[in-house]
């Protein structure tokens, strides 16, 4: 599924889902919430083939994000220095993004269900949706091993990411993007990221990381049974209880918290993405979005969430509600005085854990080159 670019006068992403079964429909919706369309100059090749880099110094790779109901394939390039990617040299381009069943692809040992195009050397991170399937017993470690062993193209890192892995990689990618956007040193950047099954927090530097279970599909099912108001209370109570187990003191020294993925989607609809905002400003804006999405009517209509695929308005509204409430819970849990920057992309670089994995691969390549 490819999403159309939003109108020029609309800053939020075009996002959508298709109707099939109820559960599959929501997985597609989760994937759509996960996306923000980023424009990449059409004159470039797989990443950039006309940027003037000396070819011997170029490092290229692709990263597959296999998570909750989606597969996103991004290709990256940078210039290597002695430590990895040289500051400011990373470029990225999303090659594909689609509704996909990563669990089925793994069981079938069939990468083509997730990746349909040639790539530079490929790294794969399997995230919350796959972790949940393994925890339920729907997928076993030997299934994953067979899937990885079946891949015929050149590869680098192939891994089921733990929640802590995902949080650390988000911190690495978010630190790079925060420096690119605002000049903030990466060691002073905390991060918050989210998907369909989990959300992650990482304090700056070598601070604590945490991954929390936030099942959007499950809460949508309960909302259909109990109504939005009761489900929203349950959702907030569960998230707040998990957040109380996180030591947020490590964020007190953060110059900035870089908020990515579905948190950035919520901020885009609330009008606080792409700029530095104080905690109170973000909280008020997200509170307004939660209120607007709490019921059909003029307030919700005024949000103007794009719907190019003519989706069921009620489920679109409900998904927005729970995603915004989740983001607001995290914002409220972090220390007063925290500065946030919500974004999926800085310039032409996608900012998420996939970037962090590419940066790690580049650092390993630089170390190999110097040894």
Language-model segment annotations:
Residues 66-67, 93-100, 122-129, 260-261:
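Short loop/turn segments at strand-loop or loop-helix junctions that form parts
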Residues 52-68:
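N-terminal module-boundary/linker segments of secreted carbohydrate-active enzymes
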Residues 39-57:
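Ser/Thr/Pro/Gly-rich low-complexity linker/stalk segments immediately outside membranes or between
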Residues 1-20:
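Short, low-complexity, Lys/Arg-enriched N-terminal segments of secretory-pathway carbohydrate enzymes
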Residues 61, 75, 100-118, 129-191, ...:
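Helical "lid/coupling" subdomains associated with nucleotide-phosphate turnover
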Residues 22-37:
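Hydrophobic membrane-insertion alpha-helices, especially the h-region
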Residues 69, 197:
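Conserved Rossmann-like nucleotide-cofactor binding loop
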Residues 78-85, 206:
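Short loop/turn segments immediately following beta-strands, especially the blade-tip
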């Amino acid at each position: 599924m490819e999403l159309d670019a939003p109108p020029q006068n609309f800053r939020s992403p075009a996002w959508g889902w298709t109707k099939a079964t109820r559960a599959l429909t929501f997985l597609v919706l989760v994937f759509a919430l996960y996306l923000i369309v980023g424009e990449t100059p059409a004159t470039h090749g797989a990443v950039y083939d006309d940027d003037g880099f000396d070819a011997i110094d170029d490092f290229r790779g692709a990263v597959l994000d296999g998570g909750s109901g989606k597969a996103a394939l991004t290709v990256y390039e940078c210039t290597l220095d002695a430590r990895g990617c040289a500051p400011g040299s990373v470029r990225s381009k999303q090659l594909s993004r689609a509704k996909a069943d990563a669990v089925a692809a793994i069981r079938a040992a069939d990468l083509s269900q997730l990746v349909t195009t040639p790539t530079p050397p490929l790294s794969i991170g399997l995230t919350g949706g796959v972790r949940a399937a393994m925890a339920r017993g729907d997928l076993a470690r030997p299934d994953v091993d067979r899937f990885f062993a079946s891949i015929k193209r050149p590869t680098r890192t192939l891994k089921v990411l733990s929640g802590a892995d995902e949080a650390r990689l988000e911190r690495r990618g978010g630190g790079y993007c925060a420096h690119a956007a605002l000049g903030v040193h990466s060691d002073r950047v905390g991060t918050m990221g989210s998907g369909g099954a989990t959300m992650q927090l990482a304090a700056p530097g070598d601070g604590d990381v945490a991954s929390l279970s936030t099942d959007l599909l499950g809460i949508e099912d309960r909302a259909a049974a109990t109504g939005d108001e009761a489900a929203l209370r349950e959702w907030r109570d569960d998230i707040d209880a998990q957040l109380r187990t996180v030591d947020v003191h490590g964020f007190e020294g953060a110059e900035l918290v870089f908020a990515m993925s579905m948190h950035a989607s919520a901020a885009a609809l609330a009008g606080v993405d792409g700029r530095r905002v104080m905690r109170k400003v973000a909280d008020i804006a997200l509170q307004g979005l939660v209120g607007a999405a709490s019921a059909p009517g003029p307030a919700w209509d005024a949000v103007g969430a794009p719907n190019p695929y003519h989706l069921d308005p009620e489920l679109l509204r409900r998904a927005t509600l729970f995603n915004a409430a989740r983001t607001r819970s995290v914002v409220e849990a972090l220390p007063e005085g925290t500065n946030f920057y919500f974004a999926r992309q800085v310039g032409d670089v996608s900012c998420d854990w996939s970037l962090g994995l590419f940066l790690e691969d580049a650092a390993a390549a630089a170390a190999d080159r110097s040894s």
